[in-house]
């Protein structure tokens, strides 16, 4: 480039249009009339500075004088010593406080508006360029004013928040200083004696934490901000750094470490020193902060007090879950339970009372947790009233001793022949029927009379309105008759006595009335309130009178129920049908049960797929007091469970699952207790007790329950009946595998094994027995149990000889001259020598003679000579017992 450079030539050098270069020169405050004018070096540098400022770069170039800096940052360091209390001693800590302040210079362009270049009216193009430049400058100025206003509002908002925080900080510091003084006073006073009163968690939480500078409260001006700033003014808010006093910082650390043990504080202190570096890094802020922590960490080593926790526990909880709630190790929880005498593992379940005791022993509190949300929702469903109660049919339960004619009476009323088809001629499950009579509909429940079906009869008495007690006129009052009276009284149900079999020649109805007087059942003719009806189920005599008595009693009771709305009731019997699945016989007590309803039944739920009455018809709905069979449940419910109809399947499923979880936890608690009881029992009884494992499958739930109770009751000190599994339905492959594993006897009551189960049973030699009568089950189990007991060896004395004289023999030694005073003495049997009724020797005969002849036996009132083998101390007056050992089969 030559010394004289024109605007046109400069535009060619920088590859910029001439018009744009003229605009840039005008923006830099230099006026030129045309592109042929000369541009000096000073004007070039001024244009370069303008362009740099426009594009956000510093106006610095080689060969020019550096302008004054726009920002100046001052750093100040101040060292001070802090004295920290460490128990009885005091420790001095060096603290370095750093302060940084930045001053920003405001450009003159914001205070002085650049003068407008004169406009030459002759040059129209220059006028247009200057007009555009003026508009651009005005827009930039308006934008800068808007941004300045936004910054001003933001600064005012930050200032307002800062003042509020300072006011709150003053209040917190007052509280902190007061509480810390109390803590330090207590700490100094307790340096000799142990801590007597723990600091509560609430008080610890009340301590304010030291406010540290946050990014929002301390905006720092970094080097990148200096380089990238567009000239805007950024003020640093006051109060962005809060100087923390030594006393407040040490008190904060002391409060934060109250829950740590001495070992944990030492370990934390060492980790802090390691992370912060050594003393050579103490000049840095992080190293200084960590050095303060590590120097004060050992200053408050005090005995700590355990935190008292309050946890909510339901009816049951596992040991591991309770330990987790109390923030303890599971092993420590097990040790605490062992000390209390409860031997459990971490996976076992304990009840609520045990959890309360062990938690109080460990210094914690336990409250009862409510886990019945779904049950409450279900209760709200049942409490809703759907309509006015209207009269309903009575529910009558037929009870009495076995073979007294209960089912025969129902057969005559229903015109059926059920008793003929029952196994053994006895009823072994509850039968539910409803009969339409001239006097209205009556629902009958036929209960078993065998002693094993006590729980069945108890359930029948609870859900009934009237109990008809059937007593045979020729047999009188029997044990199950007395039991039926007790069930009726326990349920508060009126009693009607039906004296059956009056057509027999040996019938004595008066005897029945007299015997029932001992059970406080007084007939009306004797001044009581119990109706007695004499009848015969064979001839039909008196049956109408019984129906009249039932109708009269029902009118007196004024039985009513709501017949619309959601149905509720009770399960009478349940079974597992191979083709239909779980089947439950239910008695509706309120509302109307319809097909498609969702219901909860114990731990099972489902949707009613079909309804069947006792004759196999499918009614559209079941009203109160009507028994029906329900199909569609998820499992076989227990007899006696209540059912409730709900709106949706979700609620039914939640309630059933919650009940199943509670039952499982309760079963775990019971089984754990039973295991410990079994261990202690085995320790006391030794190894003599035999165990008979049984696997029982039955057709209905009621029979299964009765079988289990009757068989378990056979256990005694010599043998224990252990029922490993019970279930409703046929014997499956899994049942057979369980029997093989546990070496159990399989009992099928009115059920059979399928093909796969039979194959496993035959291959492994499992004892499988089928029954249809409960008497046979009990007798067979007794025989099997007796076989396990083996035989018992008994000793039976067959003869006694009295020693009258003693002779000496060179061959046998001492020979006793005896008189047989009882029984017979045989040579092949063992003997005992008694002196003053005390056994002095037990052995065998070496010689038995009479008149110097060897004989095999000597009978009563006969003299003989007895030589005792290997015993020569026989004396006059001794007694010699001859006995034999016999084997006796042991029975239950």
From Swiss-Prot:
Its main location: cytoplasm. One of its GO terms (cellular component) is cytosol. Gene3D superfamilies: P-loop containing nucleotide triphosphate hydrolases, Putative DNA-binding domain, N-terminal subdomain of bacterial translation initiation factor IF2, Translation factors, Translation initiation factor IF- 2, domain 3. The keyword Protein biosynthesis applies. SUPFAM superfamilies: Initiation factor IF2/eIF5b, domain 3, P-loop containing nucleoside triphosphate hydrolases, Putative DNA-binding domain, Translation proteins. One of the essential components for the initiation of protein synthesis. Protects formylmethionyl-tRNA from spontaneous hydrolysis and promotes its binding to the 30S ribosomal subunits. Also involved in the hydrolysis of GTP during the formation of the 70S ribosomal complex. Belongs to the TRAFAC class translation factor GTPase superfamily. Classic translation factor GTPase family. IF-2 subfamily. This is Translation initiation factor IF-2. It comes from Xylella fastidiosa (strain M12). The lineage of its organism: Bacteria, Pseudomonadati, Pseudomonadota, Gammaproteobacteria, Lysobacterales.
